């Protein structure tokens, strides 16, 4: 089974998007793949699913959170290398239909 790491950056109010984001990814993203979610946030994560790995990320004002996106993601490079695929999806993105690995990789 292919393995997919999916990154979410949600600090401050953007952490509120995590539950619906995660739910839509679980339902529609890469069926048949083992998924691990790398969640970068400054907030508290309580009762999170087992397939979420949290990373602390200080809240940065616009535009710095976007400008430093790749530096943020690189902090998880060792874990990302364990996966067959890696994908970053915006925190306010919701999947509404199935997305197969062959559609994006």
Regions found by a protein language model. Name each.
Residues 1-65, 78-82:
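N-terminal anchoring/stem segment of glycosyltransferases
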Residues 65-72:
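Glycine-rich, basic loop-to-helix element that forms the pyrophosphate-binding segment
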Residues 73-105:
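GT-A fold catalytic core of metal-dependent nucleotide-sugar glycosyltransferases
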């Amino acid at each position: 089974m292919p393995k997919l790491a999916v990154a979410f950056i949600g600090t401050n109010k953007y952490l509120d998007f995590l539950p619906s984001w995660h739910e839509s990814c679980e339902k529609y993203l890469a069926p048949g793949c083992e998924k691990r979610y790398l969640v970068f946030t400054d907030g508290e994560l309580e009762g999170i699913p087992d397939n979420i790995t949290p990373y602390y990320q200080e809240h940065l004002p616009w535009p710095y959170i976007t400008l430093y996106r790749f530096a943020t993601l690189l902090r998880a490079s060792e874990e990302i290398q364990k996966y067959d695929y890696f994908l970053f999806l915006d925190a306010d993105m919701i999947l509404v239909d199935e997305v197969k690995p062959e559609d994006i990789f």
